């Protein structure tokens, strides 16, 4: 596969201290599972998401208690905050006033034009964007009557309906999502959207399932979309701790070379030649490098048959043998280490590489 091409013609949109679209990297987003009015629990979860690599976080804003919590939450976190609003324009106004960096609301669903105008005016004054969220499971009645069932054409038509409402009010800081739980439908909808308008696209396979099944489904769908150069932000939706969503999203982006601030692990599937405890070593190293924000490729390989050749693809790696391992750096043997010190020595080398990377970045 050739290099992934970003949709460089996508309109850039500011969200807090980030710019989405243009030539910028794909941004990882997640959503809290706490009651938003419970500020302590919500902030604690967002802090965990930040640590895992989440770059934008969305909170549900179903009522006034949730909207009233926005200012305090915003004050205590370090990443842009998105308020998710349905139907009630007053909650959108309150969230904007409270410091939300973006709101997710469909303008066609909040009533009379003056209500939409009030939300747009407030968003303009604060310089925050609006995400239009189209979902195959909640398309407008007129769309379903026209197409008979959720289709990609219907989803794009729904998005355009909401986009035009905002454009008529001279509002263009728009982000669009077209989510479906059916992977093929989502892929087709995003492809059509990318050909139809230049607003940034937020990717997601909605209601994808539990940690295992949802990871597979999201990787299949989001991977297919990303491989076409489509997408500016991404959320993996799982029936699991949202930290797991961030981990999966990061791995999907790394698989396509779209994450410049994350370390990657290569490890072999093991076979009868293995004479070291490779699985536990690989798991420990994976956990160790998960918080390293440098594009380092680390290999943990089980034997001397394929190990040296595969290690050449990595920046640093270890190939196990009988009770010892060969430590490689950029494909060349650095030294032999006993099995009991393999993990410790590999971690030291990873740290050195990370320090070298950060030193170059500062230079």
Curated annotation (Swiss-Prot):
GO terms for molecular function: 4 iron, 4 sulfur cluster binding; 4-hydroxy-3-methylbut-2-en-1-yl diphosphate synthase activity (ferredoxin); 4-hydroxy-3-methylbut-2-enyl-diphosphate synthase activity (flavodoxin); iron ion binding. Gene3D superfamilies: Dihydropteroate synthase-like (3.20.20.20), Sulfite Reductase Hemoprotein, domain 1 (3.30.413.10). [4Fe-4S] cluster binds at residues 268, 271, 303, 310. Coiled coil: none annotated. Its EC number is 1.17.7.3. Signal peptide: none annotated. Keywords: 4Fe-4S, Iron, Iron-sulfur, Isoprene biosynthesis, Metal-binding, Oxidoreductase. It comes from the Bacteria. One of its GO terms (biological process) is isopentenyl diphosphate biosynthetic process, methylerythritol 4-phosphate pathway. Its cofactor is [4Fe-4S] cluster. SUPFAM superfamilies: Dihydropteroate synthetase-like, Nitrite and sulphite reductase 4Fe-4S domain-like. Converts 2C-methyl-D-erythritol 2,4-cyclodiphosphate (ME-2,4cPP) into 1-hydroxy-2-methyl-2-(E)-butenyl 4-diphosphate. NCBIfam families: ispG_gcpE (TIGR00612), PRK00366.1 (NF001540). PANTHER family: 4-HYDROXY-3-METHYLBUT-2-EN-1-YL DIPHOSPHATE SYNTHASE, 4-HYDROXY-3-METHYLBUT-2-EN-1-YL DIPHOSPHATE SYNTHASE (FERREDOXIN), CHLOROPLASTIC. This is 4-hydroxy-3-methylbut-2-en-1-yl diphosphate synthase (flavodoxin). It comes from Geobacillus sp. (strain WCH70).
């Amino acid at each position: 596969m050739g290099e992934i091409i970003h949709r460089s013609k996508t309109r850039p949109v500011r969200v807090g201290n980030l710019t989405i679209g243009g030539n910028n990297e794909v941004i990882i987003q997640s959503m809290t599972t706490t009651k938003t009015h419970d500020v302590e629990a919500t902030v604690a979860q967002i802090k965990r998401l930040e640590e895992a690599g989440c770059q934008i976080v969305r909170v549900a804003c179903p009522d006034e208690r949730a909207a009233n919590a926005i200012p305090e939450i915003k004050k205590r976190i370090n990443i842009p905050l998105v308020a998710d609003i349905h139907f009630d324009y007053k909650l959108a106004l309150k969230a904007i006033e409270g410091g939300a960096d973006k709101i997710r609301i469909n303008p066609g669903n909040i009533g009379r034009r003056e209500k939409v105008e009030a939300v747009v005016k407030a968003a303009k004054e604060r310089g925050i964007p609006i995400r239009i969220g189209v979902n195959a499971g909640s398309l407008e009645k007129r769309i379903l009557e026209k197409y008979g069932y959720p289709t990609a054409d219907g989803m794009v038509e729904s998005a355009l309906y909401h986009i035009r409402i905002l454009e008529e009010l001279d509002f263009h800081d728009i982000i669009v999502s077209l989510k479906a739980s059916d992977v093929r439908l989502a892929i087709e909808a995003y492809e059509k959207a990318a050909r139809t308008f230049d607003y940034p696209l937020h990717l997601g396979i909605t209601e994808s399932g539990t940690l295992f099944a949802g990871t597979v489904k999201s990787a299949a769908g989001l991977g297919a979309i990303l491989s076409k150069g489509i997408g500016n932000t991404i959320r993996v939706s799982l029936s699991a701790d949202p930290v797991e969503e961030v981990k999966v999203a990061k791995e999907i982006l790394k698989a396509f070379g779209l994450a410049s601030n994350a370390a990657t692990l290569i490890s072999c599937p093991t076979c009868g030649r293995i004479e070291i405890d490779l699985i536990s070593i690989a798991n420990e190293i994976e956990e160790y490098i998960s918080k390293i924000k440098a594009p380092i490729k680390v290999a943990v390989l089980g034997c001397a048959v394929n190990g040296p050749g595969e290690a050449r693809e990595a920046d640093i790696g270890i190939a196990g043998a009988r009770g010892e391992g060969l430590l490689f750096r950029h494909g060349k043997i650095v030294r032999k280490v006993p099995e009991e010190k393999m993990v410790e020595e590999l971690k030291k080398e990873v740290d050195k590489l990370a320090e070298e990377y950060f030193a170059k970045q500062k230079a």
